[in-house]
From Swiss-Prot:
Gene Ontology MF annotations: ATP binding; glycerol kinase activity
Official protein name in the record: Glycerol kinase
Entry's EC annotation: 2.7.1.30
Amino-acid positions noted as binding sn-glycerol 3-phosphate in the UniProt annotation, renumbered to this chain: T15, R85, E86, Y137, D252
UniProt KW keywords: ATP-binding, Glycerol metabolism, Kinase, Nucleotide-binding, Transferase
Listed HAMAP family: Glycerol_kin
InterPro entries: ATPase_NBD (IPR043129), Carb_kinase_FGGY (IPR000577), Carb_kinase_FGGY_CS (IPR018483), FGGY_C (IPR018485), FGGY_N (IPR018484), Glycerol_kin (IPR005999)
CDD domains registered for this protein in UniProt: ASKHA_NBD_FGGY_GK (cd07769)
Activity regulation behaviour: Inhibited by fructose 1,6-bisphosphate (FBP).
Catalysed reaction, written as an equation: glycerol + ATP = sn-glycerol 3-phosphate + ADP + H(+)
Length: 508
């Protein structure tokens, strides 16, 4: 750690934007800079990002936040990275040029690959070894698609010229030199989202690679989330302007777990973003799900044993509110969803299931599509706004119930973070739907904070978990107001609505 370095920098490379946040010893945000990037939608179901644009945005936010605070590399003890998971990039080792756009986690072009895996029995092997169901969500199928459909990638992959990575790997490679010797590495949390890593061995699995015809030569090394030795060091002529060790990498939802200090078995958090991601810490135990959840690595610090988690991934939550704004035009901004929904006392019998790209946890139905059910002439825009907020909360209830069935753990409190947590009505509905207290922390940027914690622990900026727990502070708490009968009746309506969305698209 630099002698007078008083800060940790964290890069948060997300689905819609990239930000850099500076934190102090108290885990308090000192400064941030954020830039959005283009969402490329070539055809229905396809979602892409430009890797070069993402790298340029990352470099820009790094330089901007340092300039705005008059800080330099010598003030930064370490750099952490957190990122959108599963998004798949392939680039040339010698030139640094991507072979194609990144295929984003939301992209569904690989639906037939996923169906074929389940049909011939390979899906059960993937579930057993990787902890994941075959789905369009994960990187393995996306990488197979690139190898099969992008000219030149297959041959380049065989001879080691083509490199695969999720956004963390792409940023690490560029920050540490790119074609001039950049490191090609990922962490265990990101690797656990590919369908290619054995959860127990924490290494790429040859049988899983064979399912997707992926050459091992193109894969990054797998390291701890907070390794004993840095992943690498930023270059003096790079965007940081000096040498700073990169010592923490976590997929975004794993980073939020660390940022929320959910470090003990039985603790859970729910992140509300484009989608929702609810994780339950299961300690050193690998809990296999029989109820549609994912088994994943939560984090690994140093050379300690990894900590695992159960995860419920929900594809469409915050983006459903964006749909009200951008496609229907019934609100002018996300904040208006609350004021509009408050014009009614309930949903008026309306349920909205936003299965725009199918349903993720716990259903895993790529054949589902969105539906608004229960409409009558009595209903208004306000009922639809209310139903949209409720859909976010009911989908989370689906996951919480599945977690209880898999783990035997029933929550008594749920920590929450993400943009929608500023919507008081939505958080009150969440407490009512779950029947447990919902708690928001003071620091809103828990994802960036988690990667900062991972980086800081590696260099002694924080001594250990007790320091992180001391930093966590409650900002607001919502307590349930519904009775059990109301809760049960409302949720039964939701489950009925979900059934109406199934078998809509032929993915056979």
């Amino acid at each position: 750690m630099a002698e007078f370095a008083e800060f940790i920098a964290a890069i948060d490379q997300g689905t819609t934007s990239t930000r850099c946040v500076i934190f102090d010893h108290n885990g308090a945000e000192v400064a941030r800079h954020q830039l959005e990037h283009e969402q490329i939608l070539p055809r229905s179901g396809w979602v892409e990002h430009n890797p070069v644009e993402i790298w340029e945005r990352t470099a820009s936010v790094l330089m901007s936040v340092l300039n705005a605070t008059n800080l330099s590399a010598k003030d930064i003890a370490a750099l952490g990275i957190t990122n959108q998971r599963e998004t798949t990039l392939v680039w040339n080792r010698n030139t640094g040029r991507p072979y194609c756009n990144a295929i984003v986690w939301q992209d569904t072009r690989t639906d037939r690959i996923a169906v074929a895996l389940d049909r011939d029995g390979r899906g059960e092997v993937i579930r057993r070894k990787a902890g994941l169901p075959p789905a369009t969500y994960f990187s393995g199928g996306k990488l197979q698609w690139i190898l099969e459909n992008v000219d030149g990638v297959g041959a380049a992959a065989e001879n080691g010229e083509a490199l695969f990575g999720t956004p963390d790997t792409w940023l690490l490679w560029n920050l540490t030199g790119g074609p001039r010797g950049g490191v090609h590495v990922t962490d265990v949390t990101n690797a656990s989202r590919t369908m290619l890593m054995d959860l127990e061995k924490l290494d790429w699995d040859d049988e899983l690679l064979s399912f997707f015809s992926i050459p091992r030569a193109m894969l990054p090394a797998i390291a701890s989330s907070s390794p004993l030795q840095p992943y690498g060091v930023t270059l003096a002529d790079g965007p940081v302007g000096g040498e700073v060790p990169i010592t923490g990498v976590l997929g975004d939802q794993h980073a939020a777990m660390v940022g929320q200090v959910c470090l003990d078995a039985g603790e859970a958090k729910n992140t509300y973003g484009t989608g929702n991601f609810l994780l339950l810490n299961t300690g050193e135990a690998i809990v296999r799900s029989g109820n549609g959840l994912l088994t994943t690595v939560c984090y690994q610090f140093g050379d300690a044993k990894p900590v695992y988690a159960l995860e419920g991934s929900i594809a469409v939550t915050g983006s459903a509110v964006q749909w009200l704004r951008d496609q229907l035009g019934i609100i002018s901004g996300a904040a208006q969803s609350e004021s509009l929904a408050r014009q009614v006392v309930d949903n008026g019998g309306v349920y909205f299931v936003p299965a725009f790209s199918g349903l993720f946890s716990p259903y895993w139905r790529s054949d589902a599509r969105g539906a608004i059910v229960g409409l009558s002439r009595f209903n208004t825009n306000a009922h639809l706004a209310r139903a949209t907020l409720e859909a976010i909360c009911y989908q989370s209830r689906d996951v919480v119930d599945a977690m209880a069935a898999d783990s035997g753990v029933r929550l008594d409190v749920l920590k929450v973070d993400g943009g929608i947590t500023s919507n008081d009505l939505c958080m009150q509905i969440q407490a009512d739907v779950l029947g447990v207290d919902v708690v928001r922390s003071v620091v809103a940027e828990t994802t960036a904070l988690g990667s900062a914690y991972a980086a800081g622990l590696a260099v002694g900026f924080w001594a250990g978990p007790s320091d992180l727990r001391a930093n966590w502070q409650e900002d607001k708490r919502w307590t349930p107001t519904w009775g059990e009968d109301q809760r049960a009746a409302a949720y039964a309506g939701w489950r009925k609505a979900v059934q109406r969305t199934l078998d809509w698209v032929d993915v056979s």
